[in-house]
Swiss-Prot record:
This is Calcium-gated potassium channel TvoK. GO terms for cellular component: plasma membrane. Keywords: Calcium, Cell membrane, Ion channel, Ion transport, Magnesium, Manganese, Membrane, Metal-binding, Nickel, Potassium, Potassium channel, Potassium transport, Transmembrane, Transmembrane helix, Transport. InterPro entries: 2pore_dom_K_chnl (IPR003280), K_chnl_dom (IPR013099), NAD(P)-bd_dom_sf (IPR036291), RCK_N (IPR003148), Trk_Ktr_HKT_K-transport (IPR050721). The gene is tvoK. It comes from Thermoplasma volcanium (strain ATCC 51530 / DSM 4299 / JCM 9571 / NBRC 15438 / GSS1). Heterooctamer composed of four full-length subunits and four soluble RCK domains.
Amino acid sequence: MRPFRTLVKVLQKIESSPLTKVFMAFIIVVLIGSYLEFLTQRNVKYSEIKNYFTAIWFTMETVTTVGYGDVVPVSNLGRVVAMLIMVSGIGLLGTLTATISAYLFQIRIERRGKLEKRLKNHTIICNWNAYTRNIIEGNRDEEAAPIVILSENTDNSEKYQNVFFVKGDCTSEDDLKNAAIEDAARVVIMSDIENNAIPEDLLDAKTLLSIFTVRKLNNAVEIIAEVRDEKNKKHAVSAGATEVLSVGELSSRLISRSISNPGLTDFILKSLSETEDFKIFSIEACGILPGMTVKDAASNLAEVCVIISVISKGKIEYPPDRSYKIGAGDYVVFLAKNKKEVEEAIKG
């Protein structure tokens, strides 16, 4: 009984499909039109439509606008039937073509709901807004970790190398699982400012809910979140975020410092740009660094970078004490032309 029920469900799904309905209508027009043409032409003198197959051949020539002209109706009644076939058949064929295109497009959209291949240690960026594109552009290194964009709005996004798009909502556990949240190394939660369905004063609420959901599914993943209101930063940390950024706070502080420090804004922006010769990087202490003082590390790495800070257990050492011993798990912040050169130098 179970196979029979499954077959019934499949047939019901096929029957309810718009593509099936249009296709069946097209077949009916072809079969009925061919039969009427056959009836009107089989006894007409000089007519070449003497059997049903030839009538079908003529009908298909007509609806597909091929028009070989090898078979044509002779009588006036046959020509009237041919005109009806032209009007109904050609219209249905156009509708069928459009329906097939829409069906294939829908399949492509549905496939975006899941990754086509399994990823590990990737970065998931939740929500698409004006800043998301800049994040992708800044992480287009060939050896960079794969990026998965999880958003309801991905239709207008471009294709990038090593970037995958999953259509969904970052507050949904199922959608996060489709983006392989269990194996992700980090999650970046952008404010969903382009979602017109969410009032501006509730954007941070969605961000907090997203943090809760992500942390529930992966307790070890690094979560970087953006909030609109600086007051919600502590709530985001309580929800499980590793780092919390407020665009408004960054902008206001940068402008404030630039008033009495000419050139500071230009320096900071250039150090964060992908097009400049020097950039700010951070790297977890490994290789020769653990156990080494900041002074010795700066001396060993002088040819490839300038150490500007050390972050230990969330505490920022700036400027770092020259006698401070770098520990395992610390992060070293530096200025350099190329991060790979620093990584190679650290290996020893």
